[in-house]
Amino acid sequence: MGARASQEPRTRVRAGLRVLLPVLLLALLLLALVAPGAQGARGRGAADKNSHRRATSSFSQSVSSLFGEDNVRAAQKLLSRLTERFVQGVDMFLETLWKVWMELLEVLGLDVSNLSQYFSPASVSNSPTRALVLVGVVLLAYWFLSLTLGFTFSLLHLVFGRFFWLVRVILFSMSCVYILHKYEGEPEHAVLPLCVVVAIYFMTGPMGYWRGSPGGLCSPSVEEKLEHLENQVRLLNIRLNRVLENLDRSKDK
């Protein structure tokens, strides 16, 4: 009991860091996206641009003087290459998933070349069959997405164990980098994908069903087992006290 009470502040701090770190990262990304648009919309003059450039140049000069200009350039080249390869790998992965999804739709007898006909309001209202097909496609897409995410994150949780939260933060950061790289010229279009990534991040957190033990997706976690054991110990103490009280009463009589 005492050991667990001493560990409660640590677990709270860790949980707070797990939530605070991605939130801060998302806030920085949103500021980086919104700030240029807000400055352009408000019509700020050249003084703001010059101040921004001065701050950027001073920061780059300080970093170059600290680590060396050659090292900074080498690090920039390495990061750019890693980012490009990462984006290419994610594109290949998404393309593979899209091909699998198209094959599933073809197996169901849907016209993959013209999917827009199933989503038009006129065709849905005129043909109830298409409405049923549309509902089936949406449910199938939800099932396919949930199955993919569930299998991926349950495998990661099984492999990394306690460090799964760190893997989640890294994947969250890499997803944000991918989205910002894809929408580099159109930052306003990156807001919705970033929100989707944030939603997936919190869905795969402590409230997600794949945060359970490896024995099953719906099995109780370690904290629930500890709480159950505490309740059992309390019940045993209560029963033991009652037995001792009954023994004392019998002796007094």
Curated annotation (Swiss-Prot):
Entry-annotated residues carrying Phosphoserine: 250
Cellular localisation: Mitochondrion outer membrane
Coiled-coil segments on the chain, per record: 219-253
KW Protease (keyword) present: no
Membrane topology: Multi-pass membrane protein
Keyword Phosphoprotein assigned: yes
Alphabetical UniProt keywords: Coiled coil, Membrane, Mitochondrion, Mitochondrion outer membrane, Phosphoprotein, Proto-oncogene, Transmembrane, Transmembrane helix
UniProt GO cellular component terms: mitochondrial outer membrane
Sequence intervals crossing the membrane: 19-39, 131-151, 164-181, 190-210
Pfam families documented for this protein: BRI3BP
Role of this protein: Involved in tumorigenesis and may function by stabilizing p53/TP53.
Subunit structure: Interacts with LETMD1. Interacts with BRI3. Interacts with BRI3; the interaction is weak. Interacts with TMEM238L.
UniProt-recorded name of the protein: BRI3-binding protein
The species this protein was found in: Mus musculus (Mouse)
Gene this protein is translated from: Bri3bp
